[in-house]
């Protein structure tokens, strides 16, 4: 079961990487909504994107990704793995989401954004690092606690539905 959960977590992480790659395929400005306000303002001032485009990209990202991630983990845990009850669902959800969180923090934030040129928006290089040490601490804390809360809420809802 643990190997299965590891693979499902890696699958969710791969989905996140794919979504990021698609978002920056025409340049990192496509995901500027993930950057700090100063980077967004600079991109707008340079005519690379408008405030409205940033808003639309952010909404599209949230509308597609969040339901997609939730559907993925629910299908894995309840349809494929057959979890029933709160505790079996909770720990499986937590493992899968935690693996994705580690991939997001280490592979995407630390390596891809922090050490490659793929996420550089022209004219904003002086605003690097795009993800500061303080951001990283917040993301680790929120990611760790957030995944536990999300897992608990989803497991609770599914325990009620499947009861």
Where are these regions (language model features)?
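Juxtamembrane boundary at the C-terminal end of a transmembrane helix
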Residues: 154-163
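Cytosolic-side membrane-entry/anchor segment at the start of a transmembrane helix
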Residues: 24-66
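Juxtamembrane non-transmembrane "cap" segments at the membrane-aqueous interface
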Residues: 105-125
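Core segments of transmembrane alpha-helices
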Residues: 59-78, 139-154
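Hydrophobic alpha-helical membrane-embedded segments
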Residues: 6-31, 96-112
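C-terminal halves and exits of single transmembrane alpha-helices
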Residues: 79, 97-105, 109, 133-150
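Short membrane-interface loop/juxtamembrane segments of multi-pass integral membrane proteins
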Residues: 40-57, 121-139
